[in-house]
């Protein structure tokens, strides 16, 4: 029962934040009305981002964010269409109307807040360094001169580029 209540609270926050906040900030924004009129909510996501959104053994897109999106769509009375996107081009996909929403591991930044309507955060996470347990790497400074893999267009990529001296490390 607690889980159901928590999901209901998250749904209320998401629906009101994404749509009501957007309508109050951008006078005349008809996004919600357009989605309801077409009857489909096109969700842009990275389909290789477990547990938030990924493909299961039947190649169906599933995950925590997908479950939340389904409940939001049910509340709005529209069908959910999950649209895998090139994560490096996510803002362009949204700006050109290819998708209605980016929902999955999207980091809130000041720059993004200036150009799009963002909901309240529903997950609190951070950038971390993942290495073998036997590695001598313990801090970001230990990565200097090493090859660092990041997802293109991610906040992890931004973080490493914002760290002086690491531009040449990104692969």
Describe the residue ranges of each PLM region.
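Flexible hinge/capping segments at coil-to-helix
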Residues: 32, 131-148
